[in-house]
């Protein structure tokens, strides 16, 4: 048969729904899911099965790594050659995974005219032995679903910040208030103004860059990202400008988890036995699950196994199903009597600084939390393993893949791909995954100890500052688990979110503005000598501007926690916040662009 002409009308196939999927969706309406994280060895006692799953995890991670980079190269090539981009769907990711893998047990047909295969052929000779996908179809489907989600999040969540920086570079405008006003007009559904710059940007973007539009027109916004990235590459030595990938990539060579569902279990059994799985697998799938995995000890009367396990060969996450309960009504804290009131100021340098109504102050610094969680130990261990590795110099000199230059991408492939198996094998046999699991276990214990020290076996009401931490707020500074801490604290006491406005800038004694403390500081140089004493500002210490105030100097975080405690007590009594803690309406800065700042995208 010849190919059908484009003019021929083809009947669209009717969309069918599987009975098991329909049944599962109905069941999910009345249930919710929870997870239990454990070591993989405690779940699987069969060494043959454990070793086989290790091999499968490694193979799927290779496919994930190669497919992500293929799509980045493919989209960049199509944009450079002015060819239309394919829609970003799960089928596209499956096609990419099929391109970078092979079938060992049967022959496969390869369409050498396909654009994706043409992109892969540009650097295929550097890859070496490709991973296999025999009896891996369902595992790859689960991987593709995750890849699609990661790509949508990558495009949606990063656009505002990168577009903000793009406007700053193109116009030279550094006032954030002005750029915010532009973005507000650019993001608006309808714009009735006559600002030439806003109109040109809206015309270039074509669609308002909301999350819904970015998801709906993802291929179009990849072109926008390409333009932004090309602009960023012109400033390689600017610290505040960071390059990025058009699409997400697997940034680490450490093995990631794979999702094993019932269909995947059927494939795994066929992979081990090299025979057809019995036809009664669907009816007896739970028998196979309980035979291969020790799941019974994690089930209870209400929590039952949900036919899914996530594993990277070192840890295992078991998904359990439980009945859906009605959400409890929010408690009226004004009518409840408490034994203790606590104000908590979360932050970056300190995970939390708390002060209760008796004046007891507790502070947990981020370095001390990371030390208790064995995170610092894990960092030192990883660094030691890398430095003792015989291929350390090769590893250290891996070039960047964050570029729009196709030749630089091919140079990356030529450098990395011949050593790909060596790198993955090193991360497989060294205990990188075990270090992460140890930090997770120690983190749970540390968080439990911290919450108990704050509550102190009393009925407690906590006022928690509404600090919304952004990743990268302080360059190269580790992030603090503020949201995790807040959710964990709700298990021990009642938590009320308090607006932090001006709590760090107002004296807790007289409610007057404060200023940063100044003093002479002697700094130690790298060569061991000391500099001359010089007047400097100490950011962590404040003093009240009012000379009559009793507050001489105090830690800035402790002052903020006392103000949060005061606002909590006012809210408990139903009183209004003082004027010094009320946000004032900022005047809109409608500064027009100068003529030399008119930029065509």
Q: Predicted regions span which residues?
A:
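Positively charged, helix-rich recognition surfaces that bind polyanionic ligands
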Residues: 2-81, 87-97, 101-127, 132-150, ...
């Amino acid at each position: 048969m010849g190919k059908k002409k484009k003019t021929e009308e083809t009947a669209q196939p009717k969309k069918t729904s599987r009975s098991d999927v329909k049944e599962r969706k109905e069941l999910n309406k009345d249930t919710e899911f929870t997870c239990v994280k454990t070591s993989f060895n405690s779940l699987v006692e069969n060494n043959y099965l454990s070793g086989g799953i290790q091999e499968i995890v490694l193979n799927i991670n290779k496919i994930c790594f190669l497919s992500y980079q293929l799509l980045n190269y493919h989209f960049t090539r199509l944009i450079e050659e002015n060819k239309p981009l394919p829609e970003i769907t799960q089928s596209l990711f499956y096609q990419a995974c099929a391109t970078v893998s092979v079938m060992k047990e049967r022959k496969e047909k390869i369409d050498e005219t396909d654009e994706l295969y043409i992109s892969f052929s540009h650097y295929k000779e550097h890859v070496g032995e490709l991973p296999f996908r025999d009896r891996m179809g369902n595992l790859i489907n689960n991987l593709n679903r995750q890849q699609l989600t990661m790509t949508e999040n990558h495009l949606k969540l990063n656009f505002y910040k990168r577009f903000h920086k793009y406007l700053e570079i193109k116009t030279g405008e550094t006032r954030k208030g002005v750029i915010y006003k532009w973005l507000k007009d650019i993001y608006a559904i309808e714009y009735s103004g006559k600002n030439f710059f806003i109109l040109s940007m809206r015309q270039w973007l074509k669609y308002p860059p909301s999350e819904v539009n970015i998801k709906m027109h993802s291929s179009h916004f990849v072109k926008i990202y390409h333009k932004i990235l090309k602009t960023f590459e012109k400033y390689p030595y600017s610290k505040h400008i960071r390059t990025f990938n058009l699409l997400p990539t697997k940034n680490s060579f450490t093995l990631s988890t794979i999702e094993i569902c019932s269909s995947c279990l059927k494939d795994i059994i066929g992979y081990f036995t090299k025979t057809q799985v019995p036809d009664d697998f669907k009816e007896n799938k739970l028998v196979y699950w309980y035979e291969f995995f020790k799941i019974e000890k994690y089930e209870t009367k209400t929590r039952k196994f949900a036919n899914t396990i996530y594993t990277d060969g070192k840890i295992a996450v078991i998904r359990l199903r439980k009945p859906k309960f009605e959400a409890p009504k929010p408690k009226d804290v004004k009518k409840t009597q408490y034994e203790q009131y606590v104000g908590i100021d979360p932050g970056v340098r300190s995970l939390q600084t708390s002060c209760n109504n008796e004046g007891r102050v507790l502070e947990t610094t981020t370095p001390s939390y990371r030390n208790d969680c064995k995170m610092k130990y894990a960092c030192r261990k990883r660094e030691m393993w890398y430095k003792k590795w015989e291929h350390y110099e090769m590893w250290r000199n891996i070039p960047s893949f964050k570029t729009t230059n196709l030749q630089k991408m091919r140079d990356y492939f030529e450098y990395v791909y011949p050593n790909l198996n060596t790198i993955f094998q090193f991360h497989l046999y060294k205990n990188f995954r075990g270090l992460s699991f140890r930090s997770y276990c120690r983190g749970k214990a540390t968080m439990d100890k911290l919450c108990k020290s704050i509550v102190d076996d009393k009925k407690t009401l906590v006022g928690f500052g509404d600090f919304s931490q952004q990743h990268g707020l302080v360059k190269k500074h580790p992030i603090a688990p503020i949201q995790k801490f807040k959710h964990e604290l709700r298990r021990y006491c009642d938590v009320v979110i308090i607006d932090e406005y001006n709590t760090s800038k107002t004296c807790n004694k007289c409610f007057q503005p404060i200023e940063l403390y100044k003093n002479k500081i002697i700094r130690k140089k790298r060569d061991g000598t000391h500099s001359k004493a010089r007047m400097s500002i100490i950011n962590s210490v404040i003093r009240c501007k009012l000379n009559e105030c009793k507050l001489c100097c105090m830690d800035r975080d402790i002052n903020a926690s006392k103000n949060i405690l005061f606002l909590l007590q006012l809210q408990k009594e139903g009183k209004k916040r003082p004027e010094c803690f009320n946000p004032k309406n900022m005047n809109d800065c409608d500064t027009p662009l100068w003529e030399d700042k008119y930029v065509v995208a």
